[in-house]
From Swiss-Prot:
Protein residues bound to sn-glycerol 3-phosphate: 12, 82-83, 134, 243
Any GO BP annotation: glycerol metabolic process
GO molecular function: ATP binding; glycerol kinase activity
Homology family: Belongs to the FGGY kinase family.
Keyword annotations: ATP-binding, Glycerol metabolism, Kinase, Nucleotide-binding, Transferase
Protein name: Glycerol kinase
Alphabetized PROSITE patterns for the sequence: FGGY_KINASES_1, FGGY_KINASES_2
Amino acid sequence: MEKYIMSLDQGTTSSRCIIFNKKGEIVSVAQKEFTQIYPKAGWVEHDPLEIWGKQAGVAGEALNIARISPEQIAGIGITNQRETTVVWNKRTGMPVYNAIVWQCRRTAGYCDELREKGIDKTIKEKTGLMLDAYFSATKIKWILDNVEGARELAEKGDLLFGNIDTWLIWNMTKGKIHVTDYTNASRTMLFNIHELKWDEELLEILDIPKSMLPEVKPSSCVYGETDEILFGVSIPIAGDAGDQQAALFGQTCFNAGMAKNTYGTGCFLLMNTGEKAVDSKNGLLTTIAVGIDGKVEYALEGSIFIGGAVIQWLRDELRMVKTAQETEKYATEVEDNNGVYLVPAFVGIGAPYWDSYARGTILGLTRGAKKEHIIRAALESMAYQTHDVLKAMEEDSGIELKALKVDGGACQNNFLMQFQSDILGVEVDRPEVVETTALGAAYLAGLAVGYWKDRNEISQNWAISRSFAPAMEDEKKEKLIKGWHKAVTKAMDWEERE
């Protein structure tokens, strides 16, 4: 009987299930979108019960599509939207409030209060994170302080907290297992990434009872088994990692200096720094890459706010293209950018500049500038921003970038990938299987149940669809980068400060 690994990929807009075979190839995919709830401006919520229902539904669907029985699943891996916060009553299994999503800004004011007290330095030292409403800690506090009766229940030990991974595992095991992994714990702003435990001082500052928190385990180990009611048989739940860390693992970035970039609406860059937690001087996050083989490995993380979103803007607002795919054709119809730079700082600019008052700008326009040059400049902006973050990572870690592995929608754009390689001066590798997030969770589960022997075996699975090698002369590259940096300085400090 042939065996497979099931991966539950619980994202921000949809719940998916992907089944993989021994070669790391996709056997079947099932996906369902769920409701985005916006109670007020800047607030974002999900219904945890809807997420669980849809996630269980797609698991059954993926088995049907693949025409395999639950007995053929050797293990289940879970990967999830990180930071999103669920608090539920352990006696009833019911959430006391909707899940507060990572994008939600409702606790920004409270974060400012903590910053005024200098707590941000303590948080950075212990958790590797910047004090921000993005992470789970202030979301938990908000629920305890604003939902009627929540704090009393928590003090009595009746409430549980979890990110989406914990919530899914709790439901899959019918409330037997309350657990998370090191990668998800490292995004709560409550976990000491050096001592590998929940931090008592931070819990005290935020007034969060420790009894609410899940047990923290490696990313690859058997946490428990699914309740038989789910599939008719018990299946080991054996892998768990936050989505970006799962993608790093799925891209087989197992050694220090290996990095991946996910080109989505924004871009997420992670670089493996090995067993060393690197403190960033450039405003990057220090995070846990994976907990495996009796140890944890660390990563530096940088995000770019506007990646593929700049292409959506060209399509929807400027109406320069009908589809995102057309941008490649237009960009290659001109020899170069003709001196045109586009800085997509629509919502400010992130690492390593960190200027929330920057705004988008197009510079270097002359009478010879055409639509094609603007489209090309938009694509190039993704590569320049990636370059800036990776250079900051190299500087922080003292580790030289060896190659960049890519995934996400925009990695299908060959012009962009070639330009990325030219600007970085390293090889850019696009894999055969671009579902690297789900694949990473599958690998973590498969290793724990012995489906794959070790990381070497997995590395042999990793197949390149296309590799892009740098082909630009150094002088030209330096000139382009200099032009980009000049453009960024013009975009900065534009919006009036209140």
